[in-house]
UniProtKB/Swiss-Prot annotation:
Descriptive protein name: Putative 8-amino-7-oxononanoate synthase 2
Region (Unknown): 1-418
Residues holding pyridoxal 5'-phosphate: 485-486, 556, 581-584
Gene Ontology CC entries for this record: peptidoglycan-based cell wall
Binding positions for substrate per the UniProt entry: 407, 510
Coiled-coil features, chain-numbered ranges: none
Keywords attached to this entry: Acyltransferase, Pyridoxal phosphate, Transferase
Annotated region (KAPA synthase), positions in chain: 419-771
GO molecular-function terms, A-Z: 8-amino-7-oxononanoate synthase activity; pyridoxal phosphate binding
Stored Pfam families: Acetyltransf_6 (PF13480), Aminotran_1_2 (PF00155)
UniProt keyword annotation of Transferase present: yes
Amino acid sequence: MPTGLGYDFLRPVEDSGINDLKHYYFMADLADGQPLGRANLYSVCFDLATTDRKLTPAWRTTIKRWFPGFMTFRFLECGLLTMVSNPLALRSDTDLERVLPVLAGQMDQLAHDDGSDFLMIRDVDPEHYQRYLDILRPLGFRPALGFSRVDTTISWSSVEEALGCLSHKRRLPLKTSLEFRERFGIEVEELDEYAEHAPVLARLWRNVKTEAKDYQREDLNPEFFAACSRHLHGRSRLWLFRYQGTPIAFFLNVWGADENYILLEWGIDRDFEHYRKANLYRAALMLSLKDAISRDKRRMEMGITNYFTKLRIPGARVIPTIYFLRHSTDPVHTATLARMMMHNIQRPTLPDDMSEEFCRWEERIRLDQDGLPEHDIFRKIDRQHKYTGLKLGGVYGFYPRFTGPQRSTVKAAELGEIVLLGTNSYLGLATHPEVVEASAEATRRYGTGCSGSPLLNGTLDLHVSLEQELACFLGKPAAVLCSTGYQSNLAAISALCESGDMIIQDALNHRSLFDAARLSGADFTLYRHNDMDHLARVLRRTEGRRRIIVVDAVFSMEGTVADLATIAELADRHGCRVYVDESHALGVLGPDGRGASAALGVLARMDVVMGTFSKSFASVGGFIAGDRPVVDYIRHNGSGHVFSASLPPAAAAATHAALRVSRREPDRRARVLAAAEYMATGLARQGYQAEYHGTAIVPVILGNPTVAHAGYLRLMRSGVYVNPVAPPAVPEERSGFRTSYLADHRQSDLDRALHVFAGLAEDLTPQGAAL
């Protein structure tokens, strides 16, 4: 049975013990003993985190130190390690449907016995892909594009003839690369026996591995090179490059009885003075092509990576290879890994003629990964892999369970008392006795809910008095309540705006404001965050439209304050309305805590003011305030208000009480801002990118979503709770922690948190991550 190199190639791999591979051999025979097929299997631990190009080696090391098992799994793989042929050698191609299911069953049993997490049948070529898919998909496998290889079909009798197929521009660099002797004084030896050089080869190869950023490579040792020389004598050749007698690079190639010539490994001394100019990799490719031609080989397989240089070789083409994957027990992990590999494995930059074909294959594999048909609306659920990837990696930390009230500290299930740096209860009123008692009394008096829309049977005198108090608090004629802050934005904006209108938004507005704009059917456009020059250009460009500027007063992820004074001026100048979301400013900023608009002296110029009760006002719900006709219009046309049950009595009463306490105890505003500034200053001194903008929110920027999630878990297990932030909440480069503070934070708890942060500074700060 043809097997590319032949299975004896694997003897050097076994003898050298590289990567602690455990080897198995599969044979499928007929009843009379005639072989049908055979395959090489091996079990190996693989670090999938090395395929994440956005996760630097320093970050990866940090996460591994915290969570040693992060993205490291044992794979039971079927393949020849060289990617030169399909993983299963068959007596006849027609035997595939008989043998492959048996192989998959044997792998399943081996994985169970071996403790492997994943099964992988790798390096299936495009020609056989559909048949493998038809057999393996019903068995729970999913396909993924693997590392693409570069091949060239040899149809020339000499290197000179091959070069003659190229343009002068492409031919010249290849031709001159062979002049390394004349130009740099480099000598090359062609060796069939090279065991004595094994230590040098391992050292030069390690330079390549150290610089590689594409995936976890095999860990070749001197024993491997010595075993290759011993077992592959007459079927391998080493080119050893020397400069002034010292080995500086090598290329090791192998071949079998078939038509394939394989470029196996290479290594180089990057400190060699002519390293860049000599381009010995290009020279070695040309020497390899010459050798392959002399041996009458019809195909030179150049492996993966270094695509740019390899594609300069005459006739070189990128060949997609497909992996079939399956988790040993969990179909969700199967789908997640397949999606992650498609997302993480680097694709080569290709010429247009190759790129089009490659893209077609990529889209085909993505479609074949789907567990649901194209017409099924739930297919998007099957396609996502962000949060399932966190679960697979063991760093999923959403929905932590707390077992007590949120004060300076909070009780977390299985973790005990931890410092809370991730609450929106800025004034600390959610546990204030007066607020708690008001909530309890309202429940006793009115019951737990109103069981109806505010428009009909859901309005209590408690709701009416709260609306009046809020309107008075903000100096607006009227206010209307909604059941949540999110609903408040949806109700107001979708009622006020319609098709043909223009909504102008800050690029970093809260998600609810964008959802509201989409729900309204209006057009909307963005201006760069707090960039008033850009806003002015947008207003000039949209002159003549019915427009409204929609903006957060304090931005929930950044803690920055909108330039509301300039916004008010621009709105007046261009005849535009302004809608401001004061959710994170009310209670904290401005006279009596009336928000950023009041602090900047422009509250009266804000056409519509929205606020929420789930932050400073210790409850749940939201409201919209403005001129009475505007508010009345929202009352009757805001779907989030009309078609939702009204605010529970307990929530309305708690908000009433919180408003009273916040005005009676103004020092709470000073305390929360002092706590935020203290922590921002302390974190910055430790080297963190911690930003203070005069609000209760202090973002800590890390720059990588995975690090943000892992760091969040590490902090929580060290006794400090922060909120992890990552896309889509923030741009990827702003991933990190959102810390926020409350007036009741004890100094001892803040110092305890700083102590924990200090212990992680070497891992999490830019200076530490670079080490």
